[in-house]
């Protein structure tokens, strides 16, 4: 059973998937930083300096804190600001992946077009066919008697 598991893990597809998941996790961190550190401050500046992360609705009368962390400590809250931030993260990530796939598809299409446009070179005929062609050509140039 252990040897089967080792063989399964050592297969190329599983290793490629593992690398993809690790890189995807790191890419998610980059997108989160892009949204939190670069995009959200600009959005906040445009819309009057608000921060989505602290937008919430208290679900009980005991919650009266000004920040989301303090409000969660006091009771249940509907944290729609956090959801908006995650939604923006997702949309940016989806847009980036869409652009990457679109670029790869465009490059693939260009390569296919170049392959179709390039004339196919016929392989040289076999030696015996070349010899027979030369003999035919020589016989055709001989004067007939």
Swiss-Prot record:
The chain crosses the membrane at residues 14-34, 38-58, 81-101. Keywords: Cell inner membrane, Cell membrane, Ion channel, Ion transport, Membrane, Transmembrane, Transmembrane helix, Transport. One of its GO terms (cellular component) is plasma membrane. Disulfide bonds: none annotated. The keyword Transport applies. GO terms for molecular function: mechanosensitive monoatomic ion channel activity. Homopentamer. Channel that opens in response to stretch forces in the membrane lipid bilayer. May participate in the regulation of osmotic pressure changes within the cell. This is Large-conductance mechanosensitive channel. It comes from Rhizobium leguminosarum bv. trifolii (strain WSM2304).
């Amino acid at each position: 059973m252990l040897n089967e598991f080792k063989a399964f893990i050592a297969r190329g597809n599983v290793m490629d998937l593992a690398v993809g998941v690790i890189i995807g996790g790191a890419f998610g961190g980059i997108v989160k930083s892009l949204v939190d550190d670069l995009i959200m401050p600009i959005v906040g500046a445009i819309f009057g300096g608000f921060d989505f992360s602290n937008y919430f609705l208290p679900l009980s009368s005991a919650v009266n804190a000004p920040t989301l962390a303090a409000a969660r400590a006091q009771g249940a809250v509907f944290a729609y600001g956090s959801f908006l931030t995650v939604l923006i993260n997702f949309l940016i990530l989806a847009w980036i992946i869409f652009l990457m796939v679109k670029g790869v598809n465009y490059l693939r299409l260009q390569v296919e077009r170049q392959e179709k446009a390039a004339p196919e070179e016929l392989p040289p005929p076999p030696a015996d066919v070349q010899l027979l062609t030369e003999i035919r050509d020589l016989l055709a140039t001989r004067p007939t008697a």
